[in-house]
Amino acid sequence: FDRALEMVHELCITHGLYLLNSVNPFRLEGQKTIGFEVVDQLGAVPDRIVLPVGNAGNISAVHKGLNELLALGFIDRLPMMTGVQAAGSAPIARAVAEGLPVVVPEPCPETIATAIRIGAPVNAEKALTAIRATGGTATTVTDAEILAMQRDIARKEGIGVEPASAASVAGIKRLVEEGAIDRDERIVCVVTGHLLKDPETVIAQCEPPIEIDADLSSLLSALSF
């Protein structure tokens, strides 16, 4: 992803194209409305908002939107902004855990959650500000935890999400188990991408389909009737 972004940026400069990645401030202006919707639909400010973090556009933008609501007097406090990254791609979570003043890029990030497989997030500093200014935190989850939560969300909620989206819910589970999140907190967890954004991951976990002859006896046999 990081090299692809560099190439696209170069292409925009040399060929006059318009970059709509999270480096684009107008994109963040759109993403900040997630914060507006949260407050509008809940009718209150949650204690915590948890988001998956890759390029860190969402967590930065939501924090910006909520700050605007605070400045306008629509809310009286900010929720704790909490980011979740994959263990193999976690420059922001590492900076939070180690108390680093800046995010140190990771040269070779690796995770099954491709949407957050980003070693040099363009909004890293904004994300650090969002987390630290609100008393939030950041954590990591393994690929195994991500895949397990992806299955749980589908089975228990009927929602198909891509692996990166499942990371945010898996992160809550991890933080609760570690005692970093109070069970009584009111939490909004953002799942950002649909299952069809990355269907190959789910297909790879499924048993191969059974092929039978087109007759009733073969069907009954396959169904163990």
Predicted regions mapped to residue ranges:
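Short glycine/threonine-rich catalytic loop with a Thr-x-Gly-x-Asp
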Residues: V53-G57, N123, E157-S165
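Active-site/ligand-binding loops adjacent to catalytic centers
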Residues: F1-N21, F26, E68-G160, V202-F225
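Catalytic phosphate/nucleotide-handling subdomain of diverse soluble enzymes
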Residues: V169-F225
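Short glycine/serine- and small hydrophobic-enriched flexible loop segments
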Residues: D40, K64-E68, A170-E177
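Glycine-rich ThDP/TPP pyrophosphate-binding loop and its adjacent helix/strand module
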Residues: K32, V38, L42-K64
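Beta-strand segments within the central parallel beta-sheet cores of soluble alpha/beta enzyme folds
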Residues: D47-P52, R77-V84, D184-V190
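A structured beta-alpha segment of the ubiquitous adenosine-cofactor-binding alpha/beta core
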Residues: L20-G43, L70
